[in-house]
Amino acid sequence: MSEVIGRQRIGASLPRKEDLRFVKGSGQFTDDLNKPDQLYGYFVRSTVAHANIRQIITVEASKSPKVVEILTGADYTADGFGPIIHRAIEGDPIDYKKPAFDRNDPVALELNQWPLALDKVRHVGEPVALVIAETVEAAADAAELVVQELEVLKPVVDVFQASDRDALEINEGAPGNIVVKHLGGNLKRTEEALKKADVVVCGKFNVPRVVSCQMEPRSGIGEYDYESNVFTITAGNQGVHRYQMMIASALKVNPGKIRVICPDTGGGFGSRGH
């Protein structure tokens, strides 16, 4: 096979150098990596789509064998940490706040996501607590003992119902539950073309739920060095710099104190960008 060099690499079909070890089962994914004396985290997740959180009770779960700690959203905020932001971060080359194309349409509503839900859950599976234990089995067993006291609210499950201006807001400040809005192209020319068309077909189309379903589940290994005050996270992802900036923003530390290592990644499809 001839070597492709220089500018010939741009747009060329390049040979993949990692495939041989993958087909031989020699890949190094996050779950293949282990650290001395590592602990295991297991998330307790909401079983309902929409509810106010009255209380997360962890007393009995904390007594389980090999459990080290159980954290809730209240513990996270008490330590002074912030949300995971889904907007432009200073120094981020991808600025979602910039106007779309040549119009002034807001591209994305500024929403903050907390690692552990605080006062409300907004979807089935949203994490409400994190059990940390010496083994994954011990963490999973203790998670079964965490009690969620929830005030169940009406969910929004239909896209047409959800997008109505008077619809129940799942995230406050998002009328019609619209978080991304964009109008592109030339409206006047489009209207003129439709007027001249022999046939115009109109309709509403409901797009089914789409999931970025990669083969490798989301996972990560977190380490902290007390001497250097450096946090290291090893996780398959689609951009170490974005991970670095988002984690630094949430932990309120200098990005230089966050080190992100990306091992082999078993698929992403966009979901591992955050």
Segments from the language model and where they lie:
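Structural alpha/beta core scaffold segments of enzyme domains
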Residues: M1-H274
